[in-house]
């Protein structure tokens, strides 16, 4: 259904069929560190970067406690930071000073699926995102060298890809900010169950 939603839309179909290369690897340097990025699709002559994304709901917003504002799925999942980094590396590759166009083609997991094509170009926001990267570059370098473990945010693509379940957790842990004084009781019940199951 999701693929059909893409192919039935004239604009998205045009972007998909546009001459360009898929899964393009580019390398560059940012803040004194080597970076390697993978572009879902790159149309070099038009300097167009296309990223494919799925989301539960394209219009749903999330509250960000740091800013006190509600954010789109693209902001909440760090796609603007990704766009800022990819754009800088692409500029080095293309030997240009202006930004390439960065488009996210997104489809929702709803039935029927929603779809959208979003331009992420926003130089002020890119500058902010890059300043955040620079602020944490020492930590990023330590993670890359294997000297420290990355901090899990639970939102980005890396987190679910590397997530390992170590125990069954109470249902209420899915509710942000919700806690239950009986959590230790749940842990005891689960431990007793596992002990019995392994006997």
Regions found by a protein language model. Give the residues of each.
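Metal-dependent nuclease catalytic cores that hydrolyze phosphodiester bonds in DNA/RNA
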Residues: 1-39, 151, 157, 173-177
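Low-complexity, compositionally biased segments
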Residues: 4, 12, 43, 54, ...
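Secondary-structure boundary elements
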Residues: 11-18, 43-51, 90-100
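Residues in well-ordered beta-strands of folded domains
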Residues: 23-25, 42, 105-106, 160
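Non-catalytic protein-protein interaction segments used by genome-maintenance enzymes to assemble
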Residues: 26-80
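Metal-dependent nuclease catalytic regions and adjoining charged, substrate-binding loops involved
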Residues: 73-80, 85-199
């Amino acid at each position: 259904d999701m693929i059909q939603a893409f192919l039935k839309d004239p604009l998205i179909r045009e972007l998909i069929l546009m001459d360009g290369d898929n899964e393009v690897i580019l390398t560059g340097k940012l803040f004194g560190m080597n970076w390697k990025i993978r572009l879902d699709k790159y149309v070099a002559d038009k300097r167009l970067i296309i990223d494919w994304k799925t989301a539960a709901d394209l219009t749903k917003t999330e509250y960000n406690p740091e800013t006190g504002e509600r954010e789109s799925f693209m902001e909440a999942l760090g796609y603007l930071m990704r766009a800022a980094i990819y754009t800088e590396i692409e500029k080095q590759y293309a030997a240009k000073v202006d930004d390439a166009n960065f488009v996210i083609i997104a489809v929702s997991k709803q039935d029927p699926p929603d779809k959208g094509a979003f331009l992420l170009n926003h130089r002020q926001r890119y500058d902010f995102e890059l300043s955040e990267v620079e602020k944490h570059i020492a930590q990023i370098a330590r993670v890359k060298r294997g000297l420290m473990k990355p901090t899990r945010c639970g939102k980005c693509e890396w987190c679910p890809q590397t997530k390992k379940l170590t125990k069954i957790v109470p249902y209420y842990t899915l509710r942000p900010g919700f806690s239950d004084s009986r959590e230790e009781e749940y842990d005891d019940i689960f431990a007793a169950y596992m002990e019995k199951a392994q006997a």
